[in-house]
Design a protein with these regions (language model features):
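Cytosolic regulatory regions of ion transport systems
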Residues: 1-194
Length: 194
């Protein structure tokens, strides 16, 4: 399997685009994906257009896990812009912003607490993507439950498939029905890993 890069064909100095990685599941695999992206997702248009790469975590227990993650990587988060959202019953119920002590990093972080199987965040993200041509969105579905990873990957709002947004989902066993789905035109943007 050939996985597409976060920056598609590349981001140059004059590019108006930025990378946005959404990591579903604050698990060991999710942390590894996010930290790897934080190491490599640096682009020259930050110097000219102040475009930052964004890494978003989505998890049912994001508030607690965010505190643990930020504590573990305190030096990084002291210098990073962080936004926290909480979604309940179809709407945003809590929003907190954490400003960096110095604003010179080209990575920003977002943590979204969303109940499992609640479509609120996906619908908001889908609406943001409808007219957005300047954000290169990639999704990494990293829950510990393989079934939950499959459900999220294959049941997102249609725009994720129509716009061919790369969706990586954690999968240790590829079943025949998944192989069939992955070869269809609709799901050719979904990539199993793990």
């Amino acid at each position: 399997i050939t996985y597409p890069p976060l920056d598609k064909e590349g981001i140059g100095v004059e590019s108006p685009c930025n990378v946005h990685l959404v990591v579903c599941g604050m698990t060991d695999m999710g942390y590894a994906m996010a930290l790897t992206a934080a190491h490599i997702a640096h682009y020259p248009n930050f110097l000219t257009a102040k475009k930052k790469s964004k890494i978003t975590f989505v998890d049912a227990d994001a508030h607690k896990k965010m505190a643990e993650f930020r504590s573990k990587y305190r030096a990084l988060f002291d210098l990073s812009y962080v936004l926290y959202h909480e979604y309940t019953a179809g709407r945003e119920t809590n929003r907190q912003e954490f400003l960096p002590s110095k604003d010179f990093l080209d990575i920003e972080w977002e943590f979204c607490q969303v109940p499992d199987f609640d479509d609120t965040y996906w619908e908001i993200l889908a609406m943001e993507q409808e007219d957005n041509t300047n954000e290169y969105l990639t999704m990494a579905i990293c829950y510990d439950s393989q079934k939950l990873c499959q459900n999220v990957a294959f049941y997102l709002p249609e725009i994720f498939y129509e716009k061919n947004i790369p969706i990586f989902y954690r999968n240790t066993i590829l079943y025949a029905y998944e192989k069939e789905l992955l070869t269809s035109d609709k799901f050719n943007n979904i990539y199993p890993f793990g």
